[in-house]
């Protein structure tokens, strides 16, 4: 009998089964070296990637929730595999998403949180894109950002903040919540940010633009046509949100943690150890308040002495 510790992570197991692990590892490495990606659609449309997307969608309990077209993963299961792959490829070639069905979920404070439910076919398309974009973006993201990233949950963010406080003897935490962040993302700015981190496949960017502009059917039956924002509930939305906030992450780090000491060389001791006392002194002389930043989605935690 296999114990819990012996079980391999299901995500990794699926990647190996569909022979995509090496491809995604290469995307991550190339992105870290600054490669420009202008031909990603063949990877997104590959049979292996589409089949993996189906597997990932199917194992999510939300796959049994229907969108505007009333279809669920059970309807997709009835389609022969070859035909399924062909349908997804055609949708990616001429992508026109169906309207997103909006529902309102009660929050602990009594307010309602809007949640968008895309049609099941659109969820599969978004999953195909996510699987290829995620390793590229991961190589660009700061290690201070958490939430909807591999091995970077809320628990990781809390542990990271706690470690900074213990290591640097910091006693105050400032919490910043970007109000209405998901509903106010500028579409043009987002596409530009994707371009700047190396995602320069024009056809793919057009697909993402169409996804962002998908009509939203409200609970009362009215339809709105969004000019900004990333729909909460969309599979690709968390990644796109992290792309938007990536510039902020690196700006804060550059201003408070790197800028004062960027011209200061580390001192190497006789034993070969690296002593960063000079960098610390340079920071003290800069007049900036010592701090560390940890972000979870649109929540930013800043620790101070």
Model-found features: residue ranges?
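Residues forming anionic-ligand binding surfaces in small-molecule and nucleic-acid pockets
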Residues: 104-109
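Conserved phosphate-binding loops in nucleotide/dinucleotide-binding enzymes
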Residues: 114-119
């Amino acid at each position: 009998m296999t114990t819990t510790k012996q079980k391999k992570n299901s995500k990794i197991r699926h990647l190996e089964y569909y022979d995509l692990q090496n491809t995604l590892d290469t995307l991550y490495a190339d992105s870290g070296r600054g490669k420009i990606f202008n031909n990603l659609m063949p990877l997104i449309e590959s049979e292996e990637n589409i089949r993996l997307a189906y597997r990932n969608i199917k194992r999510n309990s939300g796959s049994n929730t229907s969108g505007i077209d009333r279809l669920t993963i059970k309807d997709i299961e009835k389609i022969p595999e070859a035909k399924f792959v062909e349908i997804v490829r055609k949708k990616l070639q001429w992508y026109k998403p169906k309207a997103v069905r909006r529902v309102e979920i009660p929050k602990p404070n009594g307010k309602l949180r809007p949640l968008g439910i895309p049609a099941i076919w659109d969820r599969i398309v978004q999953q195909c894109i996510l699987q290829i974009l995620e390793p590229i973006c991961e190589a660009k993201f700061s290690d201070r950002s958490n939430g909807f990233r591999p091995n970077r949950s809320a628990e990781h963010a809390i542990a990271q903040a706690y470690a900074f406080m213990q290591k640097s003897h910091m006693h105050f935490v400032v919490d910043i919540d970007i109000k209405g962040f998901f509903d106010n993302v500028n579409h043009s700015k987002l596409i530009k940010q994707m371009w700047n981190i190396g995602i320069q496949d024009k056809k793919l960017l057009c697909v993402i633009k169409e996804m962002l502009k998908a009509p939203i059917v409200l609970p009362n039956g009215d339809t709105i046509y969004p000019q900004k924002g990333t729909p909460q509930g969309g599979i690709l939305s968390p990644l796109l949100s992290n792309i938007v906030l990536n510039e902020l992450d690196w700006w804060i780090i550059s201003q408070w943690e790197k800028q004062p000491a960027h011209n200061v060389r580390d001192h190497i001791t006789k034993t070969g150890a690296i002593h960063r006392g000079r960098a610390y002194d340079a920071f003290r002389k800069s007049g900036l308040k010592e701090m560390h930043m940890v972000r979870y989605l649109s929540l930013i935690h800043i620790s101070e002495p």
